[in-house]
Amino acid sequence: MRVCVTFLLVWTLCLGQAFAHNKRVYGYLEEATLLEQHLTLPAKLDTGAKSASLYAKHIRPIDIHGKPYLQFVVPTKAGDVHFTCVYVGDVDIKARSGEIAGTRLKNSFIRRPVVNMSLQLGGDIRTIRVNLANRRRFLYPLLLGRETLVAFDALVDPKQKFTLKHAVNRL
């Protein structure tokens, strides 16, 4: 009986390791491409954040064939890039220091609009939910949280950065 239990335990551990090796290892910083406009941006892969967040300005709702969309601008060093994406709702995000003027941070939330976007990391493409935010004061215009990392079956190595090669225009 002990032999069977030991065998099953070892087999389970080995099987788990085999599945873990199928995951892609990314650095904590990578270049990601928003395929709607073929815009490649530096992105921070953050296992502490739940959702993806993109620096966007001039956000306005529009209606296309009876469906809700958002038009917005992503500022880049080369100029503004305009997007029109399907609006999927809003999300409440816990406020960070300096995000809400004149309020204390304890239990403060910011409501942000969410859109679906096609994102490419390396050779993989997924449609992800992205909340639109003013990320001007952050170093990276795109933050990819756990939901996106799970969608890409990703592992993040905090010792690495910019491990992927892109052939798409970087602005």
Question: Language-model segments: which ranges?
Answer:
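Pepsin/retropepsin-fold aspartyl endopeptidases
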Residues: 19-171
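Bacterial N-terminal signal peptides
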Residues: 5-15
